């Protein structure tokens, strides 16, 4: 019987009526999720930061002791670095040399930057007034455990992936890609690899053009020839 042509508007209406919303999802690795659409709301698995830590390089001390004792020189009793905490409880007159991102040892609540301190052997003097909790980052300052990171239906971008990684999410649920089949019909069509055309033949333009047009991370393409 062959294929009967129909009016464009009727064809468009028929296609729209046959569309079924795509709800299937899949769980994929975080580093594969760029330009995918989240199928679930995603929350943080941890507090970020997980512990109170230093926002600067400098010296940590107890603000109350500093306020009550003018010109006090603190005894420096250790060093705290990111990933290498000082597991010691500091006394009131003690300080710790501390670096950005390092966990705050127990017994201190304030950080003075290096340039605001005078170090002499195992002593340090704080040059300027500092308020309690200055230059420290409290637990959960960036994200609290259970806080929203990505909404359902969000197109995931590179900053989203960074935020998801920081919040302890190694996998994400996303909608499966839309599937498109491309078929180019016509007895006169030949592939561009053919070097010599026969009478009546033309090179197939639509197929390679459409395959290229839809070649992206949003779609799964089926080449039907």
Each model region followed by its residue ranges:
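Short, low-complexity N-terminal leaders and the immediately following helix N-cap/first helix
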Residues: 1-69, 122
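Short, glycine/charged-enriched hinge/interface segments at domain edges or termini
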Residues: 2, 59-223
């Amino acid at each position: 019987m062959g294929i009967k042509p129909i009016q464009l508007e009727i064809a468009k209406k028929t296609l729209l009526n046959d569309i079924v919303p795509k709800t299937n999802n899949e769980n994929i690795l975080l580093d594969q999720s760029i330009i995918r659409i989240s199928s679930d709301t995603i929350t943080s698995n941890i507090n970020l930061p997980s512990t109170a830590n230093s926002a600067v390089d400098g010296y940590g001390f107890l603000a109350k002791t500093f306020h009550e004792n003018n010109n006090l020189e603190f005894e420096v009793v250790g060093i705290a670095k990111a990933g290498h905490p000082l597991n010691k409880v500091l006394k009131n007159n003690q300080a710790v040399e501390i670096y950005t991102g390092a966990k705050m040892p127990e017994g201190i609540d304030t950080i003075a930057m290096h340039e605001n301190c005078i170090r002499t052997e195992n002593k340090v003097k704080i040059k300027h007034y500092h308020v309690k909790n200055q230059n420290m980052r409290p637990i959960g300052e960036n994200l609290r455990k259970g806080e929203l990171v990505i909404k359902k239906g969000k197109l995931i971008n590179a900053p989203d992936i960074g935020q998801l990684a920081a919040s302890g999410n190694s996998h994400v649920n996303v909608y499966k890609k839309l599937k498109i089949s491309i078929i180019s019909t016509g007895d006169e069509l030949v592939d561009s690899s053919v070097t010599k055309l026969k009478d009546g033949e033309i090179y197939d333009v639509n197929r390679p053009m459409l395959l290229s047009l839809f070649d992206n991370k949003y779609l799964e393409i089926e080449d039907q020839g």
